[in-house]
């Protein structure tokens, strides 16, 4: 599966909104819970560059009340 540029950013922003938070509120939660920078511009830049680490995504999911679950998809040949 090829992922289009901007797809990950859009998905993360959508999940933040679906959880009932603004980007600024999500950044504040990450700062409080995990010691992230409280800079919204830094977080936005990471999303734009698609440079979030897997650990970062897990922490973001946690503060939003989500859990990342790997689900087996189609078999590859």
Language-model region placement:
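Short, charged recognition helix plus adjacent turn
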Residues: 2-3, 62, 69-77
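A short, Lys/Arg-rich alpha-helix, primarily the initiator
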Residues: 1-23, 29, 67
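Recognition helix of helix-turn-helix/homeodomain-like DNA-binding domains
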Residues: 31-52
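DNA major-groove recognition helix of helix-turn-helix/homeodomain DNA-binding modules
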Residues: 53-69
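Alpha-helical residues within the helix-turn-helix
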Residues: 28, 32, 62
